[in-house]
Amino acid sequence: MNDWLFDLGNSRFKCASLREGVIGPVTVLPYLTETMDAFALQELPRGRVAYLASVAAPAITTHVLEVLKIHFEQVQVAATVAACAGVRIAYAHPERFGVDRFLALLGSYGEGNVLVVGVGTALTIDLLAANGCHLGGRISASPTLMRQALHARAEQLPLSGGNYLEFAEDTEDALVSGCNGAAVALIERSLYEAHQRLDQSVRLLLHGGGVASLLPWLGDVVHRPTLVLDGLAIWAAVAANV
């Protein structure tokens, strides 16, 4: 039986098989709320070992774990540690560093100096030097969360829609231009500072469900949609040999 990798985020739930270190095709599963969809959970794959990375609410994580423990002989939950597989985290308290960010760094190690950007509910930015040293990062709201926050405080502002323009002439266009533009500007600023700090070339790696709307404005970028799962596979290999 195969092992399986599960990436449970704040808004997306993905899985992929893992066989002899090779990740299979990625499946996007129905996202689960705290009320849970029992049928969707029962449709989760079965296998030998399940490796779970979760940044979801505790109630959702608990429900998913309960089902995985039925479907698998063993369940292991990924957690951030100070050093793993060549990567050393900058945080003085590594447990405060999100496991999704941690795994994305594991997945990108070995590709030189990289600025790793995750676009989901939050926008996360982390600088990883070629020697595996994490040099810190930033957390901001993603464009989607910015739109949601604005709509929550002013219902007349739409949640979606609009086209990116540098100087928009209607509200929908102004919203997408402002929110996406803020994210692009933060990424560009971080990339500039990364070059200044390292005095070397730095690759820009993007992952996460909200990446598509930013890609056209970021120039030379590598899109790595499976980066967290790639890192989880590395973490699984380390865990299996402990």
UniProtKB/Swiss-Prot annotation:
GO terms for molecular function: ATP binding; pantothenate kinase activity. Keywords: ATP-binding, Coenzyme A biosynthesis, Cytoplasm, Kinase, Nucleotide-binding, Potassium, Transferase. GO terms for cellular component: cytoplasm. It is an enzyme of class 2 (transferase). Pathway: Cofactor biosynthesis; coenzyme A biosynthesis; CoA from (R)-pantothenate: step 1/5. One of its GO terms (biological process) is coenzyme A biosynthetic process. Its main location: cytoplasm. Substrate binds at residues 91, 98-101, 171. The active site is at residue 100. A monovalent cation. Ammonium or potassium. Homodimer. Catalyzes the phosphorylation of pantothenate (Pan), the first step in CoA biosynthesis. This is Type III pantothenate kinase. It comes from Xylella fastidiosa (strain 9a5c). The gene is coaX.
